[in-house]
């Protein structure tokens, strides 16, 4: 199940390239590499926090960590354990994954990996401009340059996303819910994630 969730979070255009035999193009895909890096890094960190505290076996820790990381990252919404009772480190990692979401052109919701990567690279470029004001720096995704208008559009989208997140969180909080429940309710709703934390944890419902 974990494997199929991860596959569903991949840009479907890459499967067409795979069928067409364009393997080099797939290997150079920035979003795919970032997506898999997010998943693998999250799985390892969560498994390390679970091992010896929540689960005794290494295999068991990895299995639960991989499943839940895939579920949250791809916004599938499944849960095989009460991750609200997991160590704080594991919960923080899952919370971060709720913002990211799957790849563009996939079944996943959230901000999308390619937008996160582009925004990160744009931030790095802005820091480079501070050190080298006359420098020329370009954002490249999968070897292709990203125009400034696209980068600014992504920045605008992310700003609007966080604005709606803040607004929705406030509205849910006004109804008498705690901040954790309010925030993750808003986040899960915007990103189509499913379970969150607090009153909407994996063992509870909306």
What are these regions (language model features)?
Residues 1-206:
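Membrane-proximal intracellular helices of multi-pass ion channels
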